[in-house]
Amino acid sequence: MKITFEIEYRTRWGEELVLLLGKRRIALQYADNGIWSGTAECRRADDGASYRYAVECAGACIRTEWYPHRLRLGDLPPLRRLRIRDCWQELPADAPFRSAAFTRGIFARTAAPSRAGRPARGLHPQQGVLLRVVAPDIRPDERLGLASECIDNWQRALPFDDAAFPEWSCALSLPEGAAYKLVVVGRGEVRPLLWEEGENRRWSTPAGDGFLVDASLQPRFPERRWRSAGTAIPVFSLRSRESFGVGEFLDLKLLVDWAAATRQRVIQLLPVNDTTMSGTWEDSYPYNANSIYALHPQFLRLTAAGVAEDDEYRRLRDELNALGEVDYERVNRTKERLLRAAFARCGARTASRADYKAFVETNRHWLLPYAAYRCLRDEYGSADFAQWGPYARYERRKVEAYCMAHGREVGFHCWVQYHLHLQLSEMSRYAHSCGIVLKGDLPIGIGRTSADAWQSPRLFHLDSQAGAPPDAFSAVGQNWGFPTYDWERMARDHFAWWRSRLHKMSEYFDAYRIDHILGFFRIWEIPAGALHGLVGHFNPAMPYEAGELRRMGFDLSDGRYTTPPLDEQTLVAIFGDLADEVRRDCIRGGRLVASCSTQRGAAARYPGDGEHDRRMREGLLTLLDDVLFVEDPYRRGHYHPRIAGGSTHSYRRLPAWLQEAFARLHDDFFYRRHDLFWRDSALRKLPVLLTATDMLACGEDLGMIPDCVPETMRMLQILSLEIQRMPKTAGASFASTADYPYLCVCSTSTHDMTPLRAWWREERTVTERFYREVLHGEGPVPEECEPWLCRRIVEMHLASPAMFAILPLQDWLAMDEGLRAADPEKERINVPAIPRYYWRYRMHLTLEQLLEAEDFNTTLCDMIAVSGRN
């Protein structure tokens, strides 16, 4: 079949259009009136293939479409020639609705697709016209239609077929010049409910030979601000009668049932990747995965993987489920023991199945290195691959030989991943069947001793650490310990590592939270020897050159501004009565001795928990933070102002005029100097990632936000995160929920914050201000955040313009006296200020009990409905 592709596009001098169909590049010819066309020989086997138009100049591609087109031939009559008229697919205003969150989840067609608009096979092969229109925001109880003056004088609409939703099709032929409009009709109805804006369209019988597929129409419907609600909870926090001391993937079925029963549409999870490194509770941190692909074995339902449900199993399950929190070490030890016994019994039988072989083959590029990593970690007793002798450096052939030699152990880890894949895939399909979206979490970092760092070390700066500057979560900044990315190297293959990562994630999730989206603009990079985040710097950045700083009054040649002050006044201020000991044991020749010259060294020298070691350790860490400038590690002689340098002793020692100079250059550096630079940095990365899959992207944009971030997120239609307690307006104590943007996720708190009830207790002055200014309360401020207060706060979020109000389960339950936890302090998931925190929160009631709480569920359902969500 010969297919002629046509598109209207206004080029500039020297530009030309090409069609990219699979591996084919087809040069288009310019006709007139801005129309370009080209012909390609296609077969029925090409049905479903994607293609894009691109603009080239002097042989180089300078612009491509945001969305691909899809070649759909299955609903056409037998043809020798076909013409397809397209329109350029730029990022549209309805981009979020084109995501899998809506097309496979919220607006997915669960009923049999309508065939009303599919008489294409009955049209004459040389005269027919098939309209194809992309309209993703048509709800499941609605259909796209076409109304015309010549179809019952506008009173009846011809419905389109939604078999390829969000693309709609309708085969028809109207009289030349007939007026028509696209409309929305109720499912099973013909009378228009919603009309296109603007003037009537006029039917024009296309010139030329062959059947025409006209995909150039773009709907002009008025914006309808659809909104919904959801719940955020880590998988490990789920509790059911069948779970084994920790939440499991199959527990999501009950959570989906509850969400559907209460009119919610989204379930937001924390990362679910394997974090096994030390084998201790420290592996409970979900953002330090050992693989960006592998799922955590703790989430496996053992009985569904072949573990016998015998007396021992039931005893262990009941013991672990009786605990108020997750016992990470015992749960994972016990699960692995039972899984190994099941693998010995039925692993060989599973390995012979065709679907298992297909899973291994499809995922071979990461699965075998991951399995080898798990084996080597056990063999050498450490996840630090630098200690693995001949395997310290990843070599593909050597690792493949290792896998062959250790086939049974490698096979065990592949078998576990296979069952995890089956169970999470089952939950994803079940959520789709209920119109529920599973929203995943994309961590900004990777584990320093992960399989990813072992397999692809050149993609990372393994000699640095990622973190965050000081903010509301931590006064000394955050040090996550992750290596930072070598973005320049990643860009060489068009960010293939990221595209592969997101593709795997999209097998299970329809939406995702981009953890610390600022990291795609710039990352806070911390020296390897530091523990705090204060002496970090942004990367990429434009640090000041030494001569530039000299002209501002800062001569850095003698090191006075780049090394800690060791004068008597500073030492006494920091160490008090220990100042003499510091001077005697830690300083030689006017410098700190080697063992105290880095924060890691100081912590190692004074590791004890007693008061002396604690004071010495914390004092040295504070002293080492006390500098005004940090030298750039990539460009010697270039310097970054130390973040929040105005709080240092070094700053207080400056004369007033120099303090003013530092304040000016500090504020310019952190709030103005990099705005366009960081925007351009993000625009080189984010569009590639956003178009890698059809998942809905939501950014975590809290903290120190330069102006370029919200601007870029709006441009790319990435949903922002709005937290009432973390206002983005300078000088505001609390954000106004009524002023939230539409394209955002709003929430009462995050996993890094205290839930409502514990927050109410934290700072009485803050909660009193909130009670007076936000809730307009009168009289004494309640000592506790009582159910009626929690409901008021929740209602404010539900009433906001935000597309999604996704609240922690703890804050939903806080509205009900009978369901809320007895101790709100036990509901905290993470404390960012504590570097090694035990992530073990587990909901205090079972999901079965939650489903049986009819009064609460009815109340919640009514609240969501009254708020206009869903």
Question: Could you tell me what each predicted segment is?
Answer:
Residues 24-28, 51-56, 614-625:
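Short intrinsically disordered, low-complexity coil segments enriched in acidic
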Residues 50, 56-57, 186, 266-275:
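Extended cationic-aromatic binding surfaces that line active-site or macromolecule-binding grooves
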Residues 51, 180, 231-233:
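Short beta-strand motif preference
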Residues 83-84:
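C2-type phospholipid-binding modules
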Residues 93-121, 126-130, 174, 199-870:
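Catalytic cores of glycan-processing enzymes that make or break glycosidic bonds
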Residues 2-48, 56-77, 128-179, 185-211, ...:
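Aromatic-rich carbohydrate-binding modules that target alpha-glucans
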